[in-house]
Amino acid sequence: MQNNNFNTTEINNMINFPMYNGRLEPSLAPALIAVAPIAKYLATALAKWAVKQGFAKLKSEIFPGNTPATMDKVRIEVQTLLDQRLQDDRVKILEGEYKGIIDVSKVFTDYVNQSKFETGTANRLFFDTSNQLISRLPQFEIAGYEGVSISLFTQMCTFHLGLLKDGILAGSDWGFAPADKDALICQFNRFVNEYNTRLMVLYSKEFGRLLAKNLNEALNFRNMCSLYVFPFSEAWSLLRYEGTKLENTLSLWNFVGESINNISPNDWKGALYKLLMGAPNQRLNNVKFNYSYFSDTQATIHRENIHGVLPTYNGGPTITGWIGNGRFSGLSFPCSNELEITKIKQEITYNDKGGNFNSIVPAATRNEILTATVPTSADPFFKTADINWKYFSPGLYSGWNIKFDDTVTLKSRVPSIIPSNILKYDDYYIRAVSACPKGVSLAYNHDFLTLTYNKLEYDAPTTQNIIVGFSPDNTKSFYRSNSHYLSTTDDAYVIPALQFSTVSDRSFLEDTPDQATDGSIKFTDTVLGNEAKYSIRLNTGFNTATRYRLIIRFKAPARLAAGIRVRSQNSGNNKLLGGIPVEGNSGWIDYITDSFTFDDLGITTSSTNAFFSIDSDGVNASQQWYLSKLILVKESSFTTQIPLKPYVIVRCPDTFFVSNNSSSTYEQGYNNNYNQNSSSMYDQGYNNSYNPNSGCTCNQDYNNSYNQNSGCTCNQGYNNNYPK
């Protein structure tokens, strides 16, 4: 961990997240890290689950050779990344938990892998394994060590959900009665939502603590979660299906420069996350730095300062991210000439070699506009940045070096050599460059943060940092042309909500990392309606007669009278693909359309542009709905393996919200039923008052307040507080 004290002669770049080499899957984090084999297996399993073998295969990745080697490696890696080390006694407790989980799961998998076995024994061993996992999970939610424990908790949840899925699909061969299978379906959907809630509690606590301490450490933790945690929380809900795709499109950030602390969760939710993201549906085109330096009477350079970062994007004259001598109003578009960046006029002093403070008159201050422009090539993206800032001695010398790819933007003129500091992630590119202002409010403000009005300015000349945002290469295709290109070989294609073609006014960027995407769209407060359109182009040779279905992941906490529509709008051929009646739900829901072909939509050639529209009629200020992603899947390879049928809903009325109408097209519909924590930075109904029995070591489950399925004959071990 680097020294965060800037009154030293240390190089202070705040780059604590290592670069990894190699790649496993184009849609996964490019990391040779402990969780990578697990993620790779899940990506395969989501395409095709090995019935009766899925859990055993997952076990071999999480506990190879019936040892906790992988989990130990996860802990050690994350401890190193975060500089947060578990105490030895806690490590020994976890070792005991791993041993108990390995032993009971090995007994079960060994037994059912025999050519012949008693179904009654298989049934008992299955539920012994499930109950052991449930009862041991609280040991992986470690108060005060949420940063490390979230990565361990995530894999134990993945392990349990894999067991439940195998039980649902293979239960009849393991002695389950129909009522047992129904109960497992109910349990699976409940635990997907409960585990996600508990995971976000861990994340919110650690992220909020680090924001207050130091922004660079908070971003370092966020990077870790983007690789070790959030792709798996996304996989949990996708385990309900076969034929989908696990794709992580979360950004990684590198922070260089002066430390920023005392940031609140509301600051992050307000302006800071928007600054870091830039224009979310556009690639970086160029970035300008408001840079100044000053010299003494002998023309010796003493201080070099970055006062603002102005990125522009390929979609138009957006100025999201402008920091430094800006104004909240009165700035005319386009903001492209140097006259818009005013001279820095505050008095600056320096400590001369005799120990005296001398004023530098404004005339001695030099302002420059330094510009870095992406390459004009077939691959118009920055791949690397070499950015370094150094205090040579407090108050005397400081300097910057800035280089994007092979182009030097700034080479320091201070009297010493600043070493290189290359920022790069394999299989990632630079999509946004920003900075965090000091001494200004970053609180939530709808008026200047809409996605249709990317104008975010601060008068903050004390800014002295640069934040580089890296996006995974799996998003490059969209950002080259602002369209999604579909090939016949794509059995599933993921469209993050922020990769839109157009979006209506009064739409906002919301941070939803558990969806494994760079945010979701929040629609609210409109008279005419809300809409996001997504452009689809078909690659040459595409079979337009292939049948597809479209999965829409959304959340609507308030009742929307007109519901949400899914439409195709192409060359005058407007087709309604589905209508979603929304009565209020605090959790994410998957809506799945009926099948269609592109011929049906009037798209008969690869040269025609198709549009999918997700929209609703107007909503008032007290209403909102969220859109996370679209997943286009081939009907021939797609199956809902864990359905949410009316009879399950009836038995779990306090666990799920879905209409009991048997014709309902909801395919996920889980509702966490936790009270929303109003102080949370996430407007998703997460509640950090969940209180598992951390001291429990016996073979039993939580004392849950869920409605037990009174018709269930399985050995659940739940102690429910609701009447049976």
Swiss-Prot record:
Lineage: Bacteria, Bacillati, Bacillota, Bacilli, Bacillales
Gene Ontology terms, MF aspect: toxin activity
Organism: Bacillus thuringiensis subsp. jegathesan
This protein's name: Pesticidal crystal protein Cry11Ba
Keyword Phosphoprotein assigned: no
Single Gene Ontology BP annotation: symbiont-mediated killing of host cell
PANTHER family: ENDOTOXIN_N DOMAIN-CONTAINING PROTEIN-RELATED, PESTICIDAL CRYSTAL PROTEIN N-TERMINAL DOMAIN-CONTAINING PROTEIN
InterPro entries: Pest_crys, Pest_crys_dom_I, Pest_crys_N_sf
Superkingdom per UniProt: Bacteria
Cross-referenced Gene3D superfamilies: Pesticidal crystal protein, N-terminal domain
Note: Toxic segment of the protein is located in the N-terminus.
UniProt xrefs under SUPFAM superfamilies: delta-Endotoxin (insectocide), N-terminal domain (SSF56849)
Homology family: Belongs to the delta endotoxin family.
Function (record text): Promotes colloidosmotic lysis by binding to the midgut epithelial cells of mosquitos. Active on Aedes aegypti, Culex pipiens and Anopheles stephensi larvae.
This protein's UniProt keywords: Sporulation, Toxin, Virulence
Pfam family, one: Endotoxin_N
